[in-house]
Amino acid sequence: MWKILETCSCFLVVAVLSGLGKAQPESFSGSAVTDDSTSGANKRGWSMLRLGRGLQMLRLGKRGGSLDALRSGHQVPMLRAGRGSPDTSGRLDANELYAVLSAILDEPRDQSRRQPPLPRYGRDNNGVARDLLDALASDGESSSNFDLLSSLNNGPSYFRPAPRGGRYKRSLPDAGPADYPSLEDYLVQSRQFARPYSSRAVALPRIGRFSGSPRLQAKAVPRPRIGRQESQMREAKSAE
C-alpha cells in the first residue's frame, strides 16, 4: 500500500514539474512580465512546497493537517529531529497528567488473584491457642479464659526453626578427637552417629548355593569367553 502511494506521489511530482517547465517559457516569452504571471508562479511554488511536506508526512505514516488546511495555505507541521512539535494539542496539562498517573499507580487490586506466600521465619507454637483464646475472650464466655491467656503470655514461647536451603547439610565441621575428653568417648560418639553407608559391604559373587538361604538356586560365575564357544565348536565338528 505504501509503495503504491509513493509511486503515485512520484508521478504527481513529475507532472507538476513538467507543468512548471512549460509555464516558465510561456511567462518569460513576452517582452514584459506582468503581476499575474509572477503571482501564478509563486502559487505554484507554494503548492510544490506543500506537496513535498505532505509526501514526507505520508512516508512517516502521520498526517499533521487536513486537506482543508492544505488548500487554505496553512503550513503543515513537520517532524524535526531534536526539536519539539509546534502542535501542542496532544500534550497533557498538569491536572490530566496527575489523573493519568493516579489511575496507573492507584489501580485497584484484584482480590481473586492469588497472593504469593510469604516466607515463614518460625511460628509460635502457642499462636493458635492465643488466637482461639482471644476470640473466646472477645465473646465474654468465661473468666477462666483470661487466666489461661495470661499463663500463656507469661510462659516461654518456642519457635520452630525456619526452613533453609541447606538444612540437610552439616553446617558445622565434624568433631575431632580433641573435642572430647577421652578417646573412648570420641569412638562411642562416632559409632553412634555414624552414617549408614559407611559400614556397607561389597557384594560377593554367588558361587553355588548359600548355606543360610536354601531358597536361592545355584548360580555360577560366568566364565570369560576366550576364543570360540563350545556350541560353535560342536557345530563345526558336526558339519565336518
From Swiss-Prot:
One of its GO terms (biological process) is neuropeptide signaling pathway. It is found in: Secreted. The modification Tyrosine amide is found at Y121. Residues 1-23 form the signal peptide. Residues 23-44, 212-240 are annotated as: Disordered. Residues 26-41 have a biased composition (Polar residues). GO terms for cellular component: extracellular region. The modification Alanine amide is found at A81. Its main location: secreted. Keywords: Amidation, Cleavage on pair of basic residues, Neuropeptide, Pyrrolidone carboxylic acid, Secreted, Signal. The modification Leucine amide is found at L51, L60. The modification Pyrrolidone carboxylic acid is found at Q115. MMG2-DPs (Myomodulin gene 2-derived peptides) bias egestive feeding programs toward ingestive ones, and modulate accessory radula closer (ARC) muscle contractions. This is Myomodulin neuropeptides 2. The gene is MMG2.
